[in-house]
Design a protein with these regions (language model features):
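Class I SAM-dependent methyltransferase SAM/SAH-binding core
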Residues: 43, 47-94
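C-terminal lobe and adjacent flexible extensions of AdoMet/dcAdoMet transferase-like proteins
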Residues: 197-204
Length: 204
């Protein structure tokens, strides 16, 4: 956790500007997410500055948006104007919520930057209702163009904590291998390929 907190705390103030380049992809993602969260209780992990939460909250019943970085959460709170949206600092590996608390869990662009992402998925599964939906869009860096690979190299030099490099196919397989049925997926065009995945718990 210390590695991620250090990097994200340091870059919290510039995060929104950094993400502007992917605005079109994110707008497309919001359109995919809104129908899924309509009138639902939602938990978002790795919310960052709350970009996704703020763009979908009008559709949801309530969103608890969390991040491991206190500085990111501070940035997220600055312009929050919705009573249905609450931000807090949480560890996605040790969530304080009861079993089956949420209709939808969103973890966007986070599983590739944490060690042992399969453990995060286990904790998500615990907090998600049995008939709930996991929304897990993730940059699939292994499909980078040459330009993307160069960009990723310099991001790594800057301290970006990339732990998993998946292709879209490898990422979806990873989700399935960890107990999820992928009911919908799409690859969105962004600075790095962005694989949108909508999942349900796999019946045992």
């Amino acid at each position: 956790m210390k590695e991620r907190k250090t990097f994200w705390d340091k870059n919290a103030g510039r995060y929104d500007r950094f993400m502007q380049k992917d605005r079109a992809a994110y707008e497309e993602m919001y359109k995919l997410i809104r129908p899924v969260v309509k009138a639902k209780t939602v938990l978002e992990l790795a919310t960052g500055t709350g970009l996704i939460a703020k763009h979908i909250v009008n559709a949801a019943a309530h969103i608890e948006a969390t991040d491991a970085s206190a500085e990111m959460v501070l940035e997220a709170k600055r312009d929050n104007q919705s009573a249905k949206l609450h931000f807090s600092v949480q560890d996605m590996f040790r969530l304080p919520y009861a079993d089956q608390s949420y209709d939808v869990v969103i973890v966007s662009n986070a599983l590739h930057i944490v060690p042992q992402p399969e453990k995060a998925l286990q904790e998500i599964k615990r907090a998600l209702k049995d008939d709930g939906v996991l929304i897990a869009p993730t940059f699939t860096h292994a499909e980078n163009s040459i330009f993307g690979k160069v960009r990723a190299f310099f991001m790594k030099l800057a301290g970006f904590p990339l732990h998993s490099r998946w292709t879209s196919e490898e990422y979806l397989r990873f989700l399935r291998q960890n107990g999820w049925t992928v009911r919908k997926s799409a690859v969105l065009k962004a600075s790095f390929p962005l694989t949108y995945a909508e999942c349900e718990k796999t019946e045992v």
